[in-house]
């Protein structure tokens, strides 16, 4: 190792570095395949080998973060979608979720440390920060993603940026980012839902309906249960009782045991 440091141009050292990087990339690609086929343990094992071969492999760290983020999502689903847990049961599952979110944050921070020009990882970090309610980090990470002109999915980062501003109560900045995201991608379901929330928070019910109605027009394309809850509330506010009741029914049927379904059933019962 000392010889390699002293003689940077030595052929043997250069060959070894290249071979390790190549081997790391092979391991990374294997991990991608395993992850896509839901073989998570095998994917993590290959990623650890990829990092051992090349500790500078930012992609490997990013994928480790995405795997942890997916696991956190699964814990959240246990708490609020497959059932609506309460008390100690919810606390237990939420603790597991938070642990996985912190793990994801740690890995993805390492990825962007190794490769500052990595917009996909910056956007992933923004998504994790939103779930951890770290609004300032979510803003900074999304902005870093948007700085890269080569990023091919800026609407996702813009939607995360707008959502972070929403939670920071900066409604004008939230509107600006989400409106731009939806304007550039009218079929962007999450963007429409978040934009509608901004309009509602500003008291602009008609604009909120304009944003959310295309989302609920096709539940197979936009299966966002919270979107149907929001649409039901908006139509109820406009006096469209039958429409609101139907939207609450659809909402409750989408995931009947979820916390959102409980809300939808409760609001449906309140309609006169």
Could you tell me what each predicted segment is?
Residues 22-53, 90-97:
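Alpha-helical segment of the N-proximal tetratricopeptide repeat
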């Amino acid at each position: 190792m000392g010889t390699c440091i002293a003689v940077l141009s030595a052929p043997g050292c250069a060959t070894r570095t290249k071979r390790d990087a190549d081997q790391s990339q092979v391991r990374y690609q294997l991990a991608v395949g395993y992850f896509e086929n839901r073989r998570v343990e095998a994917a993590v094992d290959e990623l650890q080998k990829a990092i051992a071969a090349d500790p500078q492999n930012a992609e490997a760290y990013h994928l480790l973060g995405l795997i942890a983020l997916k696991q956190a999502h699964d814990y959240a689903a246990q708490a609020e979608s497959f059932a609506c847990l309460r008390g100690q049961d919810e606390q237990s599952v939420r603790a597991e979720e938070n642990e996985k979110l912190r793990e994801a944050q740690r890995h993805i921070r390492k990825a962007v440390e190794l490769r500052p020009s990595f917009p996909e990882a910056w956007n992933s970090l923004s998504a994790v920060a939103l779930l951890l309610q770290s609004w300032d980090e979510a803003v900074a990470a999304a902005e870093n993603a948007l700085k890269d002109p080569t990023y091919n999915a800026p609407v996702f980062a813009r939607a995360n940026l707008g959502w972070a501003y929403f939670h920071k109560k900066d409604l004008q900045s939230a509107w600006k980012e989400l409106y731009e995201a939806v304007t550039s991608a009218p079929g962007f379901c999450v963007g429409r839902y978040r934009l509608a929330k901004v309009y509602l928070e500003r008291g602009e019910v008609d604009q909120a309906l304009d944003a959310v109605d295309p989302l609920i027009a096709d539940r197979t394309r936009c299966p966002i249960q919270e979107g149907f809850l929001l649409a039901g509330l908006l139509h109820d506010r406009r006096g469209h009782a039958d429409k609101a009741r139907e939207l609450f029914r659809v909402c409750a049927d989408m995931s009947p045991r979820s916390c959102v379904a409980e809300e939808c059933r409760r609001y449906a019962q309140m309609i006169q």
